[in-house]
UniProtKB/Swiss-Prot annotation:
Lineage, opening ranks: Bacteria, Pseudomonadati, Campylobacterota, Epsilonproteobacteria, Campylobacterales
Modified residues (N6-(pyridoxal phosphate)lysine): 37
PROSITE patterns xrefs: ALANINE_RACEMASE
Any Pfam family the entry gives: Ala_racemase_C
Record's protein name: Alanine racemase
Catalytic activity field: L-alanine = D-alanine
Superkingdom of the source species: Bacteria
Length: 377
């Protein structure tokens, strides 16, 4: 039984389909790290991870310690990498929970080494190389090779992997992405020349997987990190139009009509004066608001699907509730409303909502609140 009259519906079959799409593209002997940060981009990290592991994922990737600890409590043996920054104070929890950490400096590695020695355990780390994202990482140069040698000499650490991140592999012209891979491959080869090898070498996110697996840029990679494509979205609209891979929608935001009321002509609906009734108006109230992830700016801007009919979202979205206009709509209290999701039900999908807000589908789905129950079909 639902605890609220609003929820996120997650299509399990679509999650499986999208993971299979990844497997059909990457080399047959490749390892796959399913990226499940931000509550699996809104799909629910535990259940999504369970599905990906069933389908053959070798590793799980998250952004922060709390996400990793949540997964570890359900998957005691699964390799989990924290792709984001891990503060030094987190070292003991990383070690005690057998989590892998991203490292980008000798100073950070030294602290982790000291903590590992103190606990008499080993900490797995993946070294981050900055090839053009200009966010975190060691530069791919001779100085960094010397730094890596020093890190490898530290006791208590297991240098399990090395990776970089592509910043715009979804661009129509792949020059920058290919230059990033050229720099990364050259750096890996320099390390190999000095007998420095890594169990895992990775660079490709969803955009890289969808657009760069047909060349030789990935010749030294053996691990791939799909993220947004697992949840049914292409990294950009341009890639959606040009990519032959079919991805299926996973996430739908739904709510029930909790009350229908008739509002006379000449009234304002909701906070402020953002919707004026120029006729007698049938208003449906939904128990869903911007605290749940339905952006406030969507009021008066989108249509939602009710019984395969389109109804306007009116007024400003409140923190916990919103309004739909039901004039000429066949609906009753308790009926389901699709705010966004499956196109077959005439609803907008998350990428269309994102376009209205001048953002991307990543933000639309990953900001769906945890207070919304995830319902898996």
């Amino acid at each position: 039984m639902l605890k609220r009259a609003s929820f996120v519906e997650v299509n399990s079959a679509s999650l499986r389909h999208n993971f299979s799409a990844v497997k059909s593209i990457v080399p047959k002997d490749a390892h796959i790290m399913a990226v499940v940060k931000a509550n699996a981009y809104g799909a629910g990290a535990i259940k999504a991870s369970e599905i990906f592991l069933q389908e053959g994922a070798n590793y799980l990737g998250v952004a922060a310690l709390d996400e990793a600890l949540e997964l570890r409590s359900h998957f005691p043996k699964t390799p989990i990498l924290i792709l984001g920054y891990s503060p030094n104070a987190n070292a003991s929890m990383l070690i005690d929970n057998d989590l892998s950490a991203m490292v980008f400096s000798l100073e950070q590695a030294e602290v982790f080494s000291q903590m590992a020695l103190k606990s008499q355990k080993r900490l797995k780390v993946h070294l981050k190389i900055d090839t053009g994202m200009h966010r975190l990482g060691l530069e791919p140069n001779f100085k960094s090779i010397e730094t890596i040698k020093k890190i490898r000499a530290l006791k208590g650490l297991e240098i399990e992997g090395i990776f970089t991140h592509l910043s715009n592999a979804d661009a129509k012209i792949k020059t920058h992405a290919k230059n990033q891979m050229k720099a990364f491959n050259a750096f890996l080869e320099q390390l190999l020349d000095q007998k420095i090898e890594f169990q895992y070498r990775h660079a490709y996110n969803s955009a890289g997987i969808l657009s760069l697996c047909n060349g030789n840029e990935n010749r030294l990679l053996n691990l791939y990190r799909p993220g947004i494509m697992l949840y049914g979205f292409y990294p950009s609209n341009g890639m959606k139009e040009s990519c032959p891979t079919i991805l299926k929608n996973v996430i739908s935001l739904k709510a029930q009509i909790v009350q229908i009321r008739s509002v006379k002509k000449g009234e304002f609906i909701g906070y402020g004066e953002h919707f004026y009734t120029n006729e007698e108006t049938l208003v449906g109230v939904l128990a869903l608001g911007y605290a749940d992830g339905l952006m406030r700016a969507l009021g008066n801007r989108i249509q939602v699907a009710i019984n395969n009919q389109l109804a306007p979202l009116i007024g400003k979205v409140c923190m916990d509730q919103c309004f739909v206009k039901l004039n000429d709509i066949q609906a009753k209290e308790g009926d389901e409303v699709i705010l966004f999701g499956d196109k077959s039900a005439r609803a907008n999908d998350a990428s269309e909502i994102a376009a209205l807000l001048n953002t991307i589908a990543y933000e639309t789905i990953s900001t769906l609140s945890k207070r919304l129950e995830r319902v898996y079909i």
